[in-house]
Swiss-Prot record:
Pathway: Pyrimidine metabolism; dUMP biosynthesis; dUMP from dCTP (dUTP route): step 2/2. This is Deoxyuridine 5'-triphosphate nucleotidohydrolase. GO terms for molecular function: dUTP diphosphatase activity; magnesium ion binding. The lineage of its organism: Bacteria, Pseudomonadati, Chlorobiota, Chlorobiia, Chlorobiales. CDD domains: trimeric_dUTPase (cd07557). It comes from Prosthecochloris aestuarii (strain DSM 271 / SK 413).
Length: 145
């Protein structure tokens, strides 16, 4: 199992945890002194009170929680958000209220999922043209909707 160092930069922070044995993402919670209300169409930055030290070659991806998206239209506008291995600051989550009603976030509310993922740097090679495929340049619904 991959070891990731984590620090509570706020003593009241709640450590992320996997909700089930086979969950890909850990639930990550808000760390707030007072409740935060997100108005419809408003975007806010929510602190978690945590900082992580990821091994080289790994990133942490922050993703929306499906229940918040379905029930309240609360999402992450930059999903998946990336936390790089060399970042040492507090993890914060950008939330947007796409719904019609104000949404209140309280301390300890699970606001996102954090997935630890391996990545590789690519070496780009400029060429005159790309190899041909049956699909070609078809995209944006070319196989139907």
């Amino acid at each position: 199992m991959l070891k990731v160092n984590i620090v509570r930069v706020n003593k009241n922070a709640i450590l992320p945890r996997y909700a089930t044995q086979h969950a890909a993402g850990m639930d990550i919670a808000a760390c707030l002194d007072v409740p935060l209300t997100i108005q419809p169409s408003e975007t806010v930055l929510v602190p978690t009170g945590l900082a992580v030290e990821l091994p080289e070659g790994y990133e942490a991806q922050l993703r929306p929680r499906s229940g918040l998206a379905l029930k309240y239209a609360i999402s992450l506008p930059n999903a998946p958000a990336t936390i790089d291995a060399d970042y040492r600051g507090e993890v914060k989550v950008i939330l947007v209220n796409l719904g019609q009603e104000p949404f209140c976030v309280n301390h300890g509310d699970r606001i996102a999922q954090m997935v630890i993922a391996r990545y590789e740097h690519a070496e780009l090679q400029e060429v005159e043209e790309l190899s041909r495929t049956p699909r070609g340049s078809g995209g944006f619904g070319h196989t139907g909707v």
